[in-house]
Amino acid sequence: MKKGIHPELKLITVKCTCGAEHKFWTMKEDIKIDLCSNCHPFYKGDTGSLIVDTEGRVQKFRNKYGDNY
């Protein structure tokens, strides 16, 4: 392999909105995520609320079309 042409890998901490932190090797500087395996309903075993809407799109759709779609 040629030297100096490959990007440098860094160990970064990925931060979730729930407060969990995960370490990954990547070329990026900083990553923030909305959901991780600690707070996602699927991984927590909550199968009743698999719709995760962080921006209100589901409620906006239901307000526009009702429950009879």
UniProtKB/Swiss-Prot annotation:
Its cofactor is Zn(2+). It comes from Kosmotoga olearia (strain ATCC BAA-1733 / DSM 21960 / TBF 19.5.1). The keyword RNA-binding applies. It holds the Pfam family Ribosomal_L31. This is Large ribosomal subunit protein bL31. Zn(2+) binds at C16, C18, C36, C39. HAMAP family: Ribosomal_bL31_1. InterPro entries: Ribosomal_bL28/bL31-like_sf, Ribosomal_bL31, Ribosomal_bL31_A, Ribosomal_bL31_sf.
